From Swiss-Prot:
It is found in: Cytoplasm. Its main location: cytoplasm. It comes from Chlamydia muridarum (strain MoPn / Nigg). This is Isoleucine--tRNA ligase. It comes from the Bacteria.
């Protein structure tokens, strides 16, 4: 592809951007639909602390397509942009930049100072975001952005929380939750599910000696650091356990019977003592592994408890319980009154109780703990295991599960409402509804919403010393209770506010909300609901449409659903498109460090935004599957789709200007069949696009219009070219111009939501003064039923299928299309052959064949062969396949033709018969010498490849035409330039030229020909003959 072509597309897009901006087109589209039905759209807010990447551009493109389409379809579509400002992503950037990485560093720096630093960097990359949003062609309203750190937004978040609290859906409790030691704060379950990795961890089996006899319980774990906090062992009361004696050590071990072979594969290595039930082990006491919490024995620690969740598929059938560090452990121990100890601080280091490992990071302590157990003969096995483990989504550090005091939303109480809400949501792709999202809802657990962090919306709870709570609903309420003017709701403005009421002093609890709570409250908080714009907010709820990546099924989609179902018993959105992840070309995650992907700016500067948009939209990534990004793929879209479309427009413009065609001259024209076909295809495309957009299926909407560009450029224009070239004005030429104008104009509107730059550029070159100012101010086209001709579309599809077969045969057997052939035979259904016989000349012209014959039976030049389809028949007939193969080989051509006509046959196998259908039999064709054959689903095509002298001479003439016109193109001659040529060639080429001189001159606008003795100009190979050609422009 010429570099000039690539450069022209980005340059055109920059001109379109300038036009949109100078003419305020986006604002005009809003004004144009003011008063029309509103299409409600919620935009998932990004953080501006990082640069936008392909994932953002993908989601932004999807949103833009749907919103542009809804606008053109007659809706008012407000598109407010929002910014996520709170939470770990911002805090983490400030911590790194200021070196506040040690425990207590932020408190020493000062919460006020830290929060103001957070406020400063929130919009670090806002200009870059605006650039990329504009450059990708996305229209959003940056003049009315909302921010999660705005006072109005935060007040609405308080209202949401207060409403949940009033319904009894908020409580304080201690639970084991995912915990980031790097951040020093708990995370929600859905955050913990966002970043799993395959890692190698320790795998150890510890020995727990019973107190009342010499038996030793074996328990397996992949977290040796939790053994320090062991408070109980659990067994399944319904399982069978065994007691054996290890012959080498003499020790007696107790473990699950089903796990015995896993740990003792050598039957001779132990002595069998006996079986015992899990129930009989319950209540037995054992010796603690470590001395740190021996005093807990009097409170119920270090005994065996029952647990039904234990399985023997892994481990030993005995489970070590550290109730502070495992959710199942926590509930089981709580049920059986086992105490809880938590000797790990928020940074993941052992506290002073663990004297031998105090201050050591728990994961680093694994080896030391295992070594100590080994030295004290308390370690049965030590190894490693590869498994999936959760990592912090922001810091990429391992998470732990830790018992913390937190505030929770009672999600499990409203789970039934969430599941009901999901039933009314239209998901694209559909499998996510009851798959990834539905299953996540079914397993939803209470949401830990409090974070012991700094930069976030403070939880509006004030508590007195005796535990009474004041849950504040609004700024006005806080001002009335505190007597202070409130100008900001962040921690450093309100933490010191003390409320005095009924003789008590109330102090705020030291937590902020999980920033996902902010995001989930966005439908209300963006409008300061219910304090302002209540009617508007309620009218636009739920959203008609949202879109984000697959990870948001456990993020924003989820939190939106939790809050909307809890507050209003409704979904937060009606329709959602879920996209997959854009990976680097090597299949790995895109990484700046690895430099394994091209920058989005480079791609758009090289190929243009529309090429990138279309590449993404026409890929599996819009169906929630992963895409390996390839700049070659973007280039292919430009070369194979956008450039041909641009050439089609240039073709129309060139000849319309040359012959002075006006779009107003389009009445009372008699259209050719090919005109009626392309118009029928056009309005069928309108219908398909509308149907697919109604289902929010962007991939299905894009694919047909890409196919249509092929129909338009490689069939309609190519087949109609001579009609446009006619020098004399005629009704047929006017019909061709009128048809092509209508197609290009309507098509510019069809593609406008998807590739808005290309559409605008086309439209501006086609529009007349009375047309709307921009394609994006037009209505989306409607189906014109009287122009849709299904039978004609089917016939043309058959013709193109036959032509494709013919081209494949020529390519396979190295027969240039410029070389004419005498005969072609088409075999197919009788009723289709009759219709196609009327267009034999069209097929003949396209394939350069003199005579096209249509047959309902295979001609004598071809033998039809049938063989069993082993995949289809294998399971059904088993070892009788050879018999069937032999019987099929013995069929006559008449019998095979009968099978092809009927679609089934009854085959005799000795005294038995078997019925076979088309799926059971593979059909192929064997052509006689001089003939070649190929089949499609509907037809068999046979070419007569025998070349006579007249055919050879015509082939040379056509080859000469090709070489001359190639020279015209390379020399950038105008389409009307007349030329003189000088030709040096062998006798056969000269004879061919003389024989076809009129044809050659007409096709190349040649007015003078000279045969010369010496080589001159460019040298060419003309069907194996060396030829030199030179040309000169001699007129117009």
């Amino acid at each position: 592809m010429d570099n000039e072509d690539k450069v022209s597309f980005p340059a055109k897009e920059e001109k379109v951007l300038t036009f949109w901006k100078e003419q305020n087109i986006f604002q005009k589209t809003l004004e144009n639909r003011d008063g029309s039905p509103t299409f409600s759209f919620y935009d998932g807010p990004p953080f501006a602390t990082g640069l936008p990447h392909y994932g953002h551009l993908l989601a932004g493109t999807i949103k833009d397509v749907v919103c542009r389409y809804a606008t053109m379809d007659g809706h008012y579509v407000p598109r407010r942009f929002g910014w996520d400002c709170h939470g770990v992503p911002v805090e983490y950037e400030v911590e790194k930049s200021l070196g506040l990485t040690e425990p207590g560093a932020i408190d020493r720096f000062g919460i006020a100072n830290f929060n103001e630093e957070c406020r400063k960097i929130v919009f670090r990359y806002v200009d870059e975001w605006k650039y990329f949003v504009d450059r990708i062609g996305r229209w959003v309203d940056f003049s009315a952005t909302w921010k999660t750190m705005d006072l109005s937004f935060m007040e609405s978040v308080w209202w949401v929380f207060h409403s949940l609290y009033k319904q009894g859906l908020v409580y304080e409790g201690t639970k084991v939750v995912p915990f980031s030691t790097k951040l020093g704060t708990p995370l929600s379950n859905f955050e913990a599910g966002q970043n799993y990795k395959e890692v190698d961890d320790p795998s150890v089996v510890a020995k727990f000696a019973l107190q009342d006899d010499q038996g030793i319980l074996l328990a397996w774990t992949t977290t040796p650091w939790t053994l320090v906090s062991n408070m109980a062992l659990a067994v399944h009361p319904g399982l069978t356990y065994v007691r054996i004696q290890d012959k080498e050590s003499g020790e007696e071990y107790i473990l699950g019977q089903e796990s015995l072979a896993r740990w003792f594969p050598d039957r001779e290595s132990y002595k069998w003592i006996g079986q015992l039930s899990g129930e009989s082990l319950v209540g037995r006491r054992y010796c603690p592994l470590f001395p740190y919490f021996q005093d807990q024995q009097d409170r119920g620690a270090f005994r065996v408890i029952p647990a039904d969740f234990i399985e023997e598929s892994e481990g030993t059938g005995v489970v070590h319980m550290a109730p502070a560090f495992g959710e199942a452990d926590f509930f089981a121990c709580q049920e059986h009154n086992v105490p809880l100890v938590c000797p790990v601080d928020n940074q993941g280091c052992f506290t002073s109780e663990v004297t031998d490992f105090v201050g050591e990071y728990i994961k680093f302590a694994d080896k030391g703990i295992a070594r100590r157990l080994k030295n004290e003969n308390k370690l049965f096995y030590q190894g490693t295991i590869r498994h999936r483990y959760p990592f912090c989504w922001r810091t990429d550090s391992p998470l732990i599960y830790k018992a913390v005091n937190s505030w929770f939303v009672s999600v499990e109480k409203v789970k039934h409402k969430m599941l009901k809400a999901n039933e009314s949501i239209h998901w694209t792709p559909g499998h996510i509804k009851h798959g990834r999202f539905g299953k996540w809802l079914e397993g939803a657990r209470d949401w830990a919403i409090s974070r012991n962090r700094y930069w976030g919306t403070p939880i509006p709870i004030w508590r007195s010393e005796d535990g009474e709570l004041l849950v504040i609903r609004s700024i006005q309420e806080l001002e009335e209770l505190s007597g202070q003017k409130i100008v900001d709701l962040h921690r450093h403005f309100i933490d010191e506010i003390v409320i005095h009421k009924n003789g008590k002093s109330f102090h705020r609890i030291p937590y902020v909300f999980d920033c996902w709570f902010d995001s989930g409250a966005m439908p209300y908080a963006q409008n300061h609901y219910p304090f302002e714009r209540a009617e508007e907010t309620e009218a636009r709820f739920p959203a008609d449409f949202i879109a984000e990546g697959l990870d948001q099924t456990r993020g924003w989609f989820y939190t939106l659903t939790v809050i909307a179902a809890a507050l209003f018993d409704q979904p937060a959105f009606k329709n959602v498109i879920v996209n997959g992840i854009v990976l680097a070309e090597d299949g790995n995650k895109m990484s700046k460090r690895l430099n394994n992907y091209p920058s989005p700016k480079k791609i758009m500067d090289t190929y243009g935004a529309d090429a990138l948009r279309l590449y993404l939209l026409n890929s599996v990534v819009v169906k929630a599957e992963d895409l390996r990004f390839s700049d070659k793929g973007v280039e292919a879209v430009l070369k194979q789709v956008l450039l041909p479309l641009s050439n089609a427009l240039a073709f129309y413009k060139t000849y319309a200007e040359l012959y002075g065609f006006s779009p107003n001259e389009t009445t009372d024209l008699e259209l050719a069949e090919i005109d009626r076909w392309i118009l029928s295809s056009l309005y069928s495309l309108v219908g398909k696009t509308r149907e697919n957009m109604a289902q929010y299926d962007l991939h299905a909407a894009v694919s047909p219009f890409i196919d249509f560009i092929e129909d338009l450029t490689n069939w309609y224009i190519r087949r109609s070219r001579r009609r446009f070239w006619e020098s004399e004005d005629s009704p047929d030429r006017r019909a061709a111009f009128a048809t092509l104008y209508e197609v290009l104009m309507v098509f510019s509107k069809i593609i406008a939501p998807f590739i808005p730059f290309t559409a605008e550029d086309m439209y501006q070159q086609l529009r007349v003064e009375t047309d709307p100012e921009s394609v994006h101010l037009c209505d989306f086209p409607h189906v014109v039923l009287e122009k849709i001709l299904p039978d004609l579309e089917k016939k043309m599809q058959d013709i193109r299928e036959i032509v494709a077969l013919g081209h494949s045969l020529r390519k396979e057997h190295k027969l240039k299309v410029r070389q004419p052939l005498q005969h072609m035979y088409i075999v197919g259904a009788k009723e289709r052959m009759a219709a196609l016989a009327q267009v034999d000349s069209l097929i003949g012209e396209e394939l350069n064949v003199k005579e096209v014959h249509f047959c309902s039976e295979t001609p004598e030049y071809v033998t039809t062969l049938v063989k069993p389809n082993f995949r289809s028949l294998g399971k059904r007939v088993g070892n009788r396949l050879p018999e069937i193969q032999k019987a099929l080989a013995g069929l006559s051509q008449e019998q095979i033709q009968a099978f092809m006509h009927n679609g089934f046959m009854v085959l005799s196998l000795g005294e038995e018969t078997i019925s076979l259908n088309e799926e059971d039999i593979t059909v192929s064709w064997e052509a006689a010498p001089g003939f070649v054959a190929r089949s499609s689903a509907s037809f068999v095509a046979i070419l007569d490849c025998q070349l006579t002298s007249p055919l050879i001479m015509e082939g040379i003439a056509r080859e000469i035409v090709n070489k001359i016109n190639t020279m015209r193109r390379n020399g950038k001659l105008h389409v009307s330039d007349r030329i003189a040529i000088r030709l040096h060639a062998p006798k056969i080429v000269q004879e061919a030229f003389s024989q076809y001189e009129e044809y050659i001159c007409e096709e190349t606008l040649t007015t003078s020909v000279s045969f010369i003795d010496d080589k001159e100009g460019e040298e060419w190979d003309v069907n194996g003959h060396a030829v030199s050609l030179s040309l000169e422009v001699i007129g117009h």
